[in-house]
Amino acid sequence: MNLEPPKAEFRSATRVAGGPVTPRKGPPKFKQRQTRQFKSKPPKKGVQGFGDDIPGMEGLGTDITVICPWEAFNHLELHELAQYGII
């Protein structure tokens, strides 16, 4: 005669009986786009090239945007220039 109580069988709660065994996947990974897309159009350049009007800048030509590219956008605030990647 067996006086021991019957032992309960414990099964893993994470496994589904009869289901395939696959490793758990983490959250989906999103790739960041390399190019920015804006809903509004980027700002247009204002007055370009002051030439010899600026003291100390004589002889550099009228294409001042090479030296000071922000001068072409002097009508905008810094945060607007940064928003469009100009600075």
Curated annotation (Swiss-Prot):
Question: What is this enzyme's catalytic activity, as reactions?
Answer: 3',5'-cyclic GMP + H2O = GMP + H(+)
Per the record, residues carrying N-acetylmethionine are: M1
Q: Which Gene3D superfamilies match?
A: Retinal cGMP phosphodiesterase, gamma subunit
Lyase recorded as keyword: no
Region annotation Disordered: residue ranges? 1-55
Report any one BP term from Gene Ontology: positive regulation of G protein-coupled receptor signaling pathway
> What is a GO molecular function of this protein?
enzyme inhibitor activity
Q: Where is the composition biased (Basic and acidic residues)?
A: 1-12
> Keywords on this record?
Acetylation, cGMP, Hydrolase, Retinitis pigmentosa, Sensory transduction, Vision
| Enzyme Commission number(s) | 3.1.4.35
GO CC terms in record: photoreceptor disc membrane; photoreceptor outer segment membrane; plasma membrane
- List, as start-end ranges, the regions of compositional bias called Basic residues: 26-44
User: Which Pfam family would be a valid example here?
Assistant: PDE6_gamma
User: InterPro entries in the record, alphabetically?
Assistant: PDE6_gamma, PDE6_gamma_sf
* Disulfides per UniProt: none
Recorded disease: Retinitis pigmentosa 57: A retinal dystrophy belonging to the group of pigmentary retinopathies. Retinitis pigmentosa is characterized by retinal pigment deposits visible on fundus examination and primary loss of rod photoreceptor cells followed by secondary loss of cone photoreceptors. Patients typically have night vision blindness and loss of midperipheral visual field. As their condition progresses, they lose their far peripheral visual field and eventually central vision as well.
Q: Which family does it belong to?
A: Belongs to the rod/cone cGMP-PDE gamma subunit family.
Record's subunit section: Oligomer composed of two catalytic chains (alpha and beta), an inhibitory chain (gamma) and the delta chain.
Q: What is the purpose of this protein? A: Participates in processes of transmission and amplification of the visual signal. cGMP-PDEs are the effector molecules in G-protein-mediated phototransduction in vertebrate rods and cones.
Name of protein? Retinal rod rhodopsin-sensitive cGMP 3',5'-cyclic phosphodiesterase subunit gamma
Q: What organism does the UniProt record list as the source?
A: Homo sapiens
What gene is it encoded by?
PDE6G
